[in-house]
Amino acid sequence: MNQNGTRLCYSVREVPPTSFVSAPANYKRASSHCTYTIPAASALTVLYYPFFTAQDRCKICILITIAILATLPWDSYLIRSAIWTYPPDAVVGLKILDIPIEEVFFFAIQTYITSLTYCIFTKPLVRPMYLRSHLERRGTRYVVATVILALMGGGTACLLLGRRMTYLGLILVWACPILLFQWMMSYPFLSELPWKPTITSICLPTLHLWFADSRAMGTGTWRIEEGTKLNFRIGGLELEEALFFLVSNMMVVLGLVGCDYAYALQEYESLSQPASDVYITLRKALSLLARPLPIDASLISALSQAVYRLQEKSQSMFLGSALFQGQLRIDLIFLYSFCRVMDDLIDEAEDEQEARFWVTECRHLLDSTHRSEPHSDHFYTGKKGEEHERLRQSISYLPPSHLSNDSFDDLLKGFEIDLKFNPQREAFPIQSEYCLDQYAGFVAGTVGVLVFDLTLFHCGHYFIQDVPRLRRAAKDMGKAMQCQPRGDGGATSGRKRAIAGNRGELYGYWTTAEGAERHKPGASVEDEGAFGATAKSWLAGDVITELCHCFIQAEYVIYLVRHQNASADTLVLLSALVYRLE
């Protein structure tokens, strides 16, 4: 029977009228899901479960809904036109618009698999750093749009030609308008994203589904009727089917990119306008797509530098921060970036005098920031000028209203103790467990408190009377991480050990168990005396046991897990966040 003059005798079998029940049920198509798609989805879910956020669930649910609604009419037309056919004994029997329920389930699970793959590979990305003005790269925008329009025109031509070009034309005419809309909406963000995570998120699910579909077609679960396809195969799979999986996964990934673009705009708005609402919802975020924001290039540059700094020098903290989201994650990145900048200035100082200069300058800049005073103009040249600008910039992006000036003061006291780790001094600065506890409190303990203060600001707390106890738990947790045993038999405190070792100046940081003898300068890195008997004694002592006990049972951990909507695996992240300043 002719249909619009384009198909001739395609109806190989009579297609029954629309109904929800068909004759004898079989589970061949369902078994294909049990073999290929459900195991893949389950494995990805288990892998990504500790990192699931409300934003992820929202994006995936919306994409699945859109995928089903967008595909149902198109797929129903293919089946009613007998381009796709299913043996009656290959499906369970339930149908929606003549589409077997197994096929409808496939739309959902394909979207779910591709979405999870995208979430896994893009989890470390800090979304606002890829924002650019919508006026940039307009040439790229129009070139890609022209290519998509050309493909859509080619699909229309295929439909007009009919016969063996029919299925190919239907795929292009269905997919290209959606791809064009997605590209025009999100091109400023998409063109700046790293290409590897995006391409991988498309290719891996596509390859998996190519294999699964070729096996399903090989067993006769379903087929494309002769006369509607090109009869060109790629590894046993029809060319049109390979193209379908490729473009459908592209639509899913571009849809997720569009959601991330909207989230990135709202995160940027919160970053550039601190008075704006800190709670991010997809509805609020999507509204920003209709009114592009002016992008401050200097702010994006500062965020990018902070991210690159952590990627290079504090990889564990950067990866761990991915469990947080939105403005909280950005504030944590700026906070830890400041710690890294200050730590590097102290470690790389040529002498103690220069190191003390940076501590004094840092204290002055922090005080000015907390008093909302403009930073005084100091003109330095050469390397010192670059270092001063790096310090000034790292402090200028800290959120002073969320953080206590006393905490920063304690952190600077920890840096001042670091200056006493000098092989030329007669006395080692840590002479007792009390000194060790105090040093750990000034360094990692303070970082734990700062992290808690940021979390409290962004997430809030119902019982204000619990806040002091939670802050103490945060500090104890930081101290426990500072003093935790390491694989080399040492401890994380005494971070100068690695620096001195690199200079060939490693000296005995620890007194002996009796406290009567100090190791001489020049001990090698391998020297057992480098950490001495007292270090081992302290690590086995009651003080460390108590600190670790506080860490394990800290209500602070429970608080963060509860308010960040994450699982108990957040402990891994927290360990990275309050880890010593390496």
Curated annotation (Swiss-Prot):
A GO BP annotation: carotenoid biosynthetic process
Its EC number(s): 5.5.1.19, 2.5.1.32
Where is the chain membrane-spanning? 34-54, 59-79, 99-121, 142-162, 170-190, 242-262
Give the metabolic or biological pathway. Carotenoid biosynthesis; beta-carotene biosynthesis; Carotenoid biosynthesis; phytoene biosynthesis; all-trans-phytoene from geranylgeranyl diphosphate: step 1/1
Q: Where in the cell is it found?
A: Membrane
Q: Which UniProt keyword terms apply here? A: Carotenoid biosynthesis, Isomerase, Membrane, Multifunctional enzyme, Transferase, Transmembrane, Transmembrane helix
Query: What InterPro entries does UniProt report for this protein, alphabetically?
Result: Isoprenoid_synthase_dom_sf, Lycopene_cyclase_dom, Squ/phyt_synthse
Q: Which GO terms describe its molecular function?
A: intramolecular lyase activity; lycopene beta cyclase activity; transferase activity
* Residue ranges of the region described as Lycopene beta-cyclase: 1-261
Entry's family note: In the N-terminal section; belongs to the lycopene beta-cyclase family.
Query: Under which name does UniProt file this protein?
Result: Bifunctional lycopene cyclase/phytoene synthase
The organism named in the record is Aspergillus niger (strain ATCC MYA-4892 / CBS 513.88 / FGSC A1513)
